Amino acid sequence: MGKLVHGVSTVGAVSFLLLTLASRRSQRARFYLNSILCVISMALSSSIGVVCGLVLSLFPGKRFNVNYIVARSFHFFMKPLIGMYVEVEGEEHLKRRPAIMVGNHQSSIDTLYLGRMFPVNSIIMAKKELKWVPFLGQFMMLSGSAFIDRKSRASAIKTM
């Protein structure tokens, strides 16, 4: 098993290096490299969320801060990758009163801008299938996310 893991790691590292070198000339290679880095950033942010979720679950009322930490860490990791600056107008209002933010995830940009503006003590509402996505699902369960069954209207309304 150890040799298999070592072999896969070596192939992965060499492939990543070749893709990095090729990305200087090829737009397609640059796209694949950025996609891989985006997935790594998401996994890293979710892993941070799992650790923070475990720690903050020991402190009553602090569990919802995990969403803030993960959202901001994802924004921190992704911003230099895509070179996009997000300016939030009226950000001071998010600190004073409740708000609803909607991201329909038509692109990865939604996650980036939500990561920039996500307030402290917030929860995430998501479809129940996300519970089983590695890293992401564990972080979401630990952070107190509300999972809805989109196929059952009554259940979705009850969750809200």
Task: Give each language-model segment a name.
Residues 2-25:
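Terminal signal-anchor or tail-anchor transmembrane helices
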Residues 1-4, 28, 77, 125:
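Intrinsically disordered, low-complexity sequence elements enriched in Ser/Thr/Gly/Pro
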Residues 80-160:
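Soluble catalytic domains of membrane acyltransferases
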Residues 3, 24-30, 62-63, 72, ...:
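Arginine residue identity/basic-tract feature
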Residues 21-87, 138-139:
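A transmembrane-helix-recognition feature enriched in membrane-embedded lipid enzymes
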